[in-house]
Amino acid sequence: MALIYKTVAQTETGREGSVKTLDGFQTKLSFPKPDLSVQTENNPEQLFASAYASCFSQAVIVVMQQHQFSFSKKPVVSVKVELHQENGLFHIKAGVELTTNSNDQEVGKKLIQKAHEMCPFSRLIRNENFLGLTLNGIKL
């Protein structure tokens, strides 16, 4: 396996403070607000959801090119990330939804499944931590 990118993130403040990467990214952190109200700082779950969504979206673009799928509007990827607690341990769970403007469920199903196989974040989240794939509002 050939290394194509590497980054290092550092923090010493847990969820209350900031995190930075050695290549220049920096953001303030806070605990997630349970009431889903807007917060000025980010939390790790938001960062994970954002990274997963952008990675999965890129996989969708690649699969569309490989299989010559086309839609009149770009498909939209939504990633849901949940933080759970059980027996004193925290667990991250995540799921992916793809929204297309196509009525062809078979093409959409092939697209989301191939993108799921390709996306490195999807390969990280497996088994009981994966909430599943959803296509145009229908859970697969």
Swiss-Prot record:
The coiled-coil regions, if any, are none
In terms of Pfam families, this protein maps to:
OsmC
Disulphide-bonded residues: none
Q: Which InterPro entries match?
A: KH_dom-like_a/b (IPR015946), OHR (IPR019953), OsmC/Ohr_fam (IPR003718), OsmC/Ohrsf (IPR036102)
Look up the record and give one Gene Ontology term from the biological process aspect: response to oxidative stress
Which family is it part of? Answer: Belongs to the OsmC/Ohr family.
Task: State the protein's name.
Answer: Organic hydroperoxide resistance protein-like
